[in-house]
């Protein structure tokens, strides 16, 4: 059969498998590819290549497949630490997750931890695959496990009562030992993923935002700010705000340039220079953002989930405590901040992931799910994500 051309006609969605070690995440990933993609065996997925994201090495396996309605990119990580790092750094963006729970064991510590992480990093939706159902003869026991999973999801503010839970067996699907628990269950799972996990809004449809990387003064024309448009569209003549570091100011974009050509607009993904009216070279700086008025506010205090690098990863050699003062690298710039650890957490060791409060010394254009690096003198020692804004 000739290899079919990749059609961009279907909406694209990024998902991943999460859950406790040995509950069957990788087997399920293999089973999905068997019916919806180019089959990848367990060993091919398990031998995940290492990648670097924000200075952190993470092993992740990527597979792709498609249903009648969508094209999926699916990420599976071999180790628990890889999951933690992946979710916090956003190395593989997740528009939704498939939580794999072994029916024979029920929810376990990493089940809980992955659900909490999904909540902290803002994974929009979860679908559950209750795996290894061929190992459980007792229907009441299955119901009990399902109830436990629903309660756990609700505890972490996911809609536990409405989340689809599909019962099946990834191994049965791979070995064709039971059509009902195997192929049928996998097809039901993907139907649930198709209908329950929302299609993400494309970056171009979101409100305009461009992190400012550089500022130039062009004699006779004014001030130009350059950067890569993160989302949305900016048209010549539109009003925008400059947010972060200093008081928010309004200005008008009087020109957009790309590769030395004048355009009438810049859009998500473009590297542009924007000419702005009535703003002096000294009034704007790297680290601020240009955005649609009112869409983003500057903040200094937030709650974050962070992963702290190990010594082997090039991180710190020693723990840190409350009042630790590193730099937080947001988009294009470092800002010093003070860390407050949660009650009961005395210190954070290299290799830990931690929920913490941060107070920056100057405000930054910020919203939930914004990611950052934690640095000491230009060296990355951690990665984090804004889980909620305090003020």
Curated annotation (Swiss-Prot):
It is found in: Cytoplasm. Pfam families: GTP_EFTU, GTP_EFTU_D2, GTP_EFTU_D3. Residues 10-201 form the tr-type G domain. Residues 55-59 are annotated as: G2. The keyword Protein biosynthesis applies. Mg(2+) binds at residue 26. The keyword Magnesium applies. It is an enzyme of class 3 (hydrolase). Residues 169-171 are annotated as: G5. Keywords: Cytoplasm, Elongation factor, GTP-binding, Hydrolase, Magnesium, Metal-binding, Nucleotide-binding, Protein biosynthesis. PROSITE patterns: G_TR_1, G_TR_2. It comes from the Bacteria. One of its GO terms (cellular component) is cytosol. GO terms for molecular function: GTP binding; GTPase activity; guanosine tetraphosphate binding; translation elongation factor activity. CDD domains: EF_Tu, EFTU_II, EFTU_III. Residues 131-134 are annotated as: G4. Residues 76-79 are annotated as: G3. GTP binds at residues 19-26, 76-80, 131-134. Belongs to the TRAFAC class translation factor GTPase superfamily. Classic translation factor GTPase family. EF-Tu/EF-1A subfamily. GTP hydrolase that promotes the GTP-dependent binding of aminoacyl-tRNA to the A-site of ribosomes during protein biosynthesis. Monomer. This is Elongation factor Tu.
